[in-house]
From Swiss-Prot:
The record marks 127, 130 as: Hydrophobic membrane-disruption site (MDiS). The keyword Secreted applies. Keywords: Disulfide bond, Secreted, Signal. GO terms for biological process: arachidonate secretion; lipid catabolic process; negative regulation of T cell proliferation; phospholipid metabolic process. Snake venom phospholipase A2 homolog that lacks enzymatic activity. Is myotoxic and displays edema-inducing activities. A model of myotoxic mechanism has been proposed: an apo Lys49-PLA2 is activated by the entrance of a hydrophobic molecule (e.g. fatty acid) at the hydrophobic channel of the protein leading to a reorientation of a monomer. One of its GO terms (cellular component) is extracellular region. It is found in: Secreted. PANTHER family: PHOSPHOLIPASE A2 FAMILY MEMBER, PHOSPHOLIPASE A2, MEMBRANE ASSOCIATED. This is Basic phospholipase A2 homolog 7.
Amino acid sequence: MRTLWLMAVLLVGVEGGVIELTKMIVQEMGKNALTSYSLYGCNCGPGGRRKPMDATDSCCYVHKCCYKKLTDCDPIKDRYSYSWVNKAIVCGEKNPHLKELCECDKAVAICFRENMDTYDKKKKINLKLFCKKTSEKC
């Protein structure tokens, strides 16, 4: 159980309603979010923003920027509700701050699907030793 929780925490940027984000990625991609994206490239998983290696990695970069813009919510602890309607993610929160969090997670799940042709299994477990800092602002 402890190992499962650790893997969940490593998921895309460490933050977010991990359960919700994991489900969104499975629904959009049909892939195991933990094994496919938690350490992908230079931006997925723990750590700061780095120069993206490809479009899939850019999804994680943008996701971290999205979290950075959130106000009045804690992406690590706060949970939100959403539904899967006609193969689409629908954020269902009345709380505008939790809806923003849901929209950040929805965007990264859709970004992964739209850029699945750039996914490179060789980048699936990247220790980030050779990742370059970026001067790009969110």
